[in-house]
Amino acid sequence: MSKTFAEIAEAFLEPEAVRIAKEAVEEYGDHERKIIQIGIHFQVCCMFCDEYLSTNGSDRFVLIEGRKRGTAVSLQNELCKSYDLEPLPFLCDIFDREEKQFVEIGITRKADDSYFQSKFGKLGNSCKIFVFSYDGRLDKNCEGPMEEQKLRIFSFLATAADFLRKENMFNEIFLPDNEETIIEMKKGKTFLELRDESVPLPFQTYEQMKDYCEKFKGNPRELASKVSQMQSNIKLPIKHYEQNKFRQIRLPKGPMAPYTHKFLMEEAWMFTKISDPERSRAGEILIDFFKKGNLSAIRPKDKPLQGKYPIHYKNLWNQIKAAIADRTMVINENDHSEFLGGIGRASKKIPEISLTQDVITTEGLKQSENKLPEPRSFPRWFNAEWMWAIKDSDLTGWVPMAEYPPADNELEDYAEHLNKTMEGVLQGTNCAREMGKCILTVGALMTECRLFPGKIKVVPIYARSKERKSMQEGLPVPSEMDCLFGICVKSKSHLNKDDGMYTIITFEFSIREPNLEKHQKYTVFEAGHTTVRMKKGESVIGREVPLYLYCRTTALSKIKNDWLSKARRCFITTMDTVETICLRESAKAEENLVEKTLNEKQMWIGKKNGELIAQPLREALRVQLVQQFYFCIYNDSQLEGFCNEQKKILMALEGDKKNKSSFGFNPEGLLEKIEECLINNPMCLFMAQRLNELVIEASKRGAKFFKTD
């Protein structure tokens, strides 16, 4: 154990807190710096529950934190049994005897409520959550704590932070939440033996294989002779693409592919309000919108503009308003909610027949034939929505991102500046708006699925953002906005397997009339009017427009939940691609060429009026982000198969650019495999059309492997 950490802990922490922290570090094998973090957390828990009595004179709080794990689990289970509570799947810090509820204490350095949101996403309302920050901020999901408790805790945290800063240990001890502790590993004898056993034949050891790979130099003649030898053993003849050129991909014909994403994008309309840190939970946000924005006045008309089951949707909307009004967010089971939620409508299995009974006929035991999906043609609406996603929205800061760690060298300074530049471009796009909506909404759905699988719950379709004006003026704390796009109803969700499905019914706001070809899956009502702010010169005027309610029943799986709730990963992939290009150019020139590369290096993004369109990397970022996000929301077996097969055509195109020969066994079969994946996925059809355009352009520029017609 490092004497430095131990001495610092003993200088300002109570001896009992230091002892508990040392035991915890040894028990869980944490880094020594955790001594101070654990000690501070334990002392805060003690301050929270010390010297407080219940109405009967006994201790009000039971301290669970600081005990051995086995003892803590036994104590928590005993408390649950004594007070007739459901057992919790996680350990809490404190138990409140007076309110018969567990308490979770958190401590953070962050200036926003992201740490609280992560805790709330895991724990929900199953216990009371209080998150204290070193700068005097308190995030919570309930009333409390007492004023005396807060003052004692904040005073202690301020003293601890000042002491650690004087010792120059604050940044070292409290690492950013996304930074992992470096683990030093040594290659032991067993590891080396296993490594040598895993090398492929004819190599005997890893070092032998490594030496061969480092000295290997390809011999084209030798490789050609080996190919000709193998060709005699293969029945399929090798076909060179110069003689067997690729034709264009045939797109399916038929009705236009409908919109299949779970939430509206371009047509979505949002109501906004200034965010209240004290009321940041999903249910509280929804209550505030209905109370302050008078959204309860939204009443769908009797006859829908299009769609099925209007009576069911209208009645369910009225039940949603009642659930929000009584603040329970729970819808009781009835004919409408059960019908739309798919409760009791699962296909029945063939009943088991006892061995003593005779089977009358085998026809009843046959499974019905699966109907293949109907092929759909390329949707004209997709291009317009793609371009809309690239453009800027009215607000910015849609996707919550982690803080940047301190830079240790000049190259990391370049990278930090580059990432902030790219994030500034991407955070204000319409695509980022939809990503933020997926992250928060699906995250809330995941919480409800885990905590209330047997209930029908109401969840807002919402996102958070920041005002552009405050961001541009450089204000210290930009105004955060809560944006409500609609309401989602989660049906019963017993997700036992990764592919387990559950039904959701969405009610989304819009000021646009439905497109019959695009919105085939929606039932759309007129639902009153709303006021739209429009700029006329330098003044802003309000115009009243019709408000539409788009209703739809769809389903989400456990895997899809995970994809959509982690949509911010699209940022990482996009920014990593451009960052690699910029840092490579800077490393070659041994100077900072980040801005020059962003502004001067061009990237092809599409065609317009028969001509290629290229944009600087700074703007092409938007296209990269939209593509990554669309992969996330439209991903299915069709898209996976298409991307897997199209790589071979792109490899042939790259070989043609480098004037290399390309060949394969069955080029026509490759195209047929690609066309098998083109059924009704809009993203697949869009990418196939883009690939055809790329082939046409390559042929005009002299490509040898593609037909011009």
UniProtKB/Swiss-Prot annotation:
Lineage of origin: Viruses, Riboviria, Orthornavirae, Negarnaviricota, Polyploviricotina
Record's keyword terms, sorted: Cap snatching, Endonuclease, Eukaryotic host gene expression shutoff by virus, Eukaryotic host transcription shutoff by virus, Host cytoplasm, Host gene expression shutoff by virus, Host nucleus, Host-virus interaction, Hydrolase, Inhibition of host RNA polymerase II by virus, Manganese, Metal-binding, Nuclease, Phosphoprotein
Function, as annotated: Plays an essential role in viral RNA transcription and replication by forming the heterotrimeric polymerase complex together with PB1 and PB2 subunits. The complex transcribes viral mRNAs by using a unique mechanism called cap-snatching. It consists in the hijacking and cleavage of host capped pre-mRNAs. These short capped RNAs are then used as primers for viral mRNAs. The PB2 subunit is responsible for the binding of the 5' cap of cellular pre-mRNAs which are subsequently cleaved after 10-13 nucleotides by the PA subunit that carries the endonuclease activity.
Cofactors (names): Mn(2+)
GO BP, sorted A to Z: cap snatching; DNA-templated transcription; symbiont-mediated suppression of host gene expression; symbiont-mediated suppression of host mRNA transcription via inhibition of RNA polymerase II activity; viral RNA genome replication; viral translational frameshifting
Post-translational modification: Phosphorylated on serines and threonines by host kinases, including human casein kinase II.
A GO molecular-function annotation: RNA binding
UniProt-recorded name of the protein: Polymerase acidic protein
GO cellular component terms listed in the entry, alphabetical order: host cell cytoplasm; host cell nucleus
Subcellular location: Host cytoplasm; Host nucleus
